[in-house]
């Protein structure tokens, strides 16, 4: 459950460490975002020498969320942190590596490149 002003960790090697959600994409009344949803965010913390700088506005897809997500078989999945991966306008990841596990729901939402780069899909 990510909403405006939520802070997320960045799970890729673009140079951003933390982002702040400024808009959940998908309609003017859309309040919350879950795993696999795209958000617009600003970079709050970045490593020196990275591809993105602090203050830059980026698009990101949520790969881990603390709020549990129900699966079609009735099971639930939740993570210890909220994390996102920065993406380009064509939904391809901006980084070349993904850190930590990602949810299987990304495959259903057509983020195949992120799923293939991830070390573990849960």
Curated annotation (Swiss-Prot):
It comes from Corynebacterium diphtheriae (strain ATCC 700971 / NCTC 13129 / Biotype gravis). Keywords: Ribonucleoprotein, Ribosomal protein, RNA-binding, rRNA-binding. The keyword Cytoplasm does not apply. Part of the 50S ribosomal subunit. Forms a cluster with proteins L3 and L19. In the 70S ribosome, L14 and L19 interact and together make contacts with the 16S rRNA in bridges B5 and B8. One of its GO terms (molecular function) is structural constituent of ribosome. This is Large ribosomal subunit protein uL14. One of its GO terms (biological process) is translation. It comes from the Bacteria. Binds to 23S rRNA. Forms part of two intersubunit bridges in the 70S ribosome. Belongs to the universal ribosomal protein uL14 family. HAMAP family: Ribosomal_uL14 (MF_01367). GO terms for cellular component: cytosolic large ribosomal subunit.
